[in-house]
């Protein structure tokens, strides 16, 4: 197998078969947390944070350690990136020390520049535009509740709320890669960028999926297999909550809206959740909610992704399955 440097910067960086490989590997890690250990020595993976995190920080820190590596966790305040050092310079330094870079930051262009200058895999752990690691965990959760990865193609998923945010973008692209029927609903002024919708439709045409963007929450949820939402206010916008939340009340996931989905529909939320706002307590704490499985699967999905990317970079086929 020829070594091939690959990155995970947005959800369509994996094709349909590659996404299946990663998800199958994630399920294996769920059954055996030490299924594979691609890092030895231990070899370091740089885990950089420009934004606060609970799930991303804990899952990548624990995950890299369980893969046999050393998670070099650096916050913005502890990095020269936080003082304006060029991304390219940071990448060149980390090339000499680390075996991969995981970065939770703001602009998508920052992780893309890191990848441009990196000689090791770079993983987008969240940007303003995309959250691909979360989507892998979400799809792993669906697969585990629906009889396997092959059944993802049969799923209809609905995302409600701020449809212009990173989660909506990633559901569009990641769902298209999986061959799902993806529905995204939000109010006018909070819909996905046309270029992302166009990319999702192009991929869906290749995989047999479909894309629907609408302002009608009921249309999106009708007969859906899984319903997703996210906080209405992203990090850094908390002071604007009263103003920003006004357009979203019709998209609150409650028992009435869930009743329009299939009777066995799942509910997922990437967390943190605000009960009584984007979702009611009856739903997130109810029998259809799988949010804690979803949160745990961040660990397994990210370990699978790092293992797969490392296998590609080393030309080691044994790490791909």
Curated annotation (Swiss-Prot):
SUPFAM superfamilies: Aspartate/ornithine carbamoyltransferase. GO terms for biological process: arginine biosynthetic process via ornithine; citrulline biosynthetic process; L-arginine biosynthetic process. Carbamoyl phosphate binds at residues 53-56, 80, 104, 131-134, 270-271, 298. Belongs to the aspartate/ornithine carbamoyltransferase superfamily. OTCase family. GO terms for cellular component: cytoplasm. Its EC number is 2.1.3.3. It catalyses: carbamoyl phosphate + L-ornithine = L-citrulline + phosphate + H(+). Disulfide bonds: none annotated. It comes from Bifidobacterium longum (strain NCC 2705). It is found in: Cytoplasm. The keyword Phosphoprotein does not apply. This is Ornithine carbamoyltransferase. The gene is argF.
């Amino acid at each position: 197998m020829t070594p091939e440097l690959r990155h995970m910067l947005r959800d369509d960086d994996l094709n349909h078969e590659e996404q299946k490989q990663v998800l199958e590997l994630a399920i294996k890690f769920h059954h055996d947390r030490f299924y594979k250990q691609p890092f030895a020595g231990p070899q370091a993976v740089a885990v950089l944070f420009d934004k606060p995190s609970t799930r991303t920080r804990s899952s990548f820190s624990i995950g890299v350690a369980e893969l046999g590596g050393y998670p070099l966790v650096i916050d913005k305040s502890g990095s020269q990136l936080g003082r304006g050092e060029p991304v390219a310079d940071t990448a060149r330094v980390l090339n000499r020390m680390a075996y991969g870079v995981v970065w939770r930051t703001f602009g998508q262009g920052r992780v893309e520049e890191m990848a441009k200058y990196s000689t090791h895999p770079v993983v987008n752990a969240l940007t303003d535009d995309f959250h691909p690691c979360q989507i892998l965990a979400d799809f792993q959760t669906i697969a585990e509740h629906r009889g396997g990865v092959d059944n993802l193609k049969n799923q209809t998923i609905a995302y409600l709320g701020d449809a212009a945010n990173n989660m909506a973008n990633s559901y569009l692209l990641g769902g298209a890669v999986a061959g799902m029927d993806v529905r995204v609903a939000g109010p006018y002024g909070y819909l996905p960028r046309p270029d992302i919708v166009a990319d999702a439709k192009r991929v869906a045409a290749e995989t047999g999926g479909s894309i629907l963007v609408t302002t009608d929450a009921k249309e999106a949820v009708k007969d859906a297999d899984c319903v997703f939402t996210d906080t209405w206010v992203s990090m850094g916008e908390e002071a604007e909550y009263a103003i920003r939340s006004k357009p979203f009340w019709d998209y609150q996931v409650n028992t009435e809206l869930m009743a329009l989905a299939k009777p066995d529909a799942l509910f997922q939320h990437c967390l943190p959740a605000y009960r009584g706002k984007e979702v009611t307590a009856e739903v997130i704490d109810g029998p259809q909610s799988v949010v804690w499985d979803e949160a745990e699967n961040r660990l397994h999905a990210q370990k699978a992704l790092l293992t797969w990317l490392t296998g590609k970079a080393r030309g080691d086929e044994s790490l791909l399955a």
